[in-house]
């Protein structure tokens, strides 16, 4: 996932600004700018990796002179102690970026790992693990990517991706004395041939 859509770059920028990475009095006070270092991103638990490219992008956004590279790729099963990525360069730059990079990777790997547990639970059955739009605002692309890394499938990315009739749509038409069949007929009549109509 080295090519990100613009909203992911914007999310990284917002996270860097939120954490005030360029105004870190602790690092400025105790880590001279000339000190060079190496940071290893290591797994602390079993799971499935997701977000390593995002973590690398964070390091490079905070300090473009940092040399960060992935050792493992997204979708890889993890064991405690596995080296995931390495970053070399200014120790101050590494320290300023590490928490944001880890936050992204931990969240994404958590989603991938949880998804994979469900995928494994239904293996051999005629079932798929499919996600929803119930994502943290701004994180939808990354959340859905993480689901895929865990072996799950994406449903709708947004409202425009299909018709999904839910109980709220039926209740909204109750005053017109319309039932489920009527609402489905309305949806089918307005849907183009490329739009899937589903009922939850």
Segments the model singles out, each with a brief description of its role:
Residues 2-200:
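Acidic/glycine-rich phosphate/pyrophosphate-binding loops and surrounding catalytic core
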């Amino acid at each position: 996932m080295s090519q990100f859509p613009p909203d992911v770059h914007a999310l990284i920028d917002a996270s860097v600004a939120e954490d005030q990475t360029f105004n870190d009095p602790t690092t400025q006070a105790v880590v001279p700018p000339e000190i060079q270092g190496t940071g290893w991103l290591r797994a602390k638990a079993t799971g499935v990796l997701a977000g390593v490219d995002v973590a690398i992008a964070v390091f490079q956004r905070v300090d473009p002179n940092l040399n960060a590279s992935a050792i493992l790729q997204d979708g890889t099963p993890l064991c405690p102690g596995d080296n995931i990525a390495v970053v070399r360069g200014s120790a101050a730059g590494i320290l300023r970026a590490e928490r944001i990079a880890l936050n992204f990777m931990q969240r994404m790997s958590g989603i991938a790992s949880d998804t994979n547990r469900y995928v494994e639970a239904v293996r051999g059955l005629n079932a798929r693990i499919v996600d929803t739009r119930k994502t943290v605002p701004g994180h939808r692309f990354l959340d859905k990517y993480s689901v895929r890394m865990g072996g799950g499938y994406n449903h709708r990315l947004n409202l425009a991706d299909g018709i999904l009739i839910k109980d709220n749509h039926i209740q909204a038409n109750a005053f017109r004395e319309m039932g489920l069949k009527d609402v489905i007929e309305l949806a089918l009549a307005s849907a183009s041939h490329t739009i899937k109509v589903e009922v939850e």
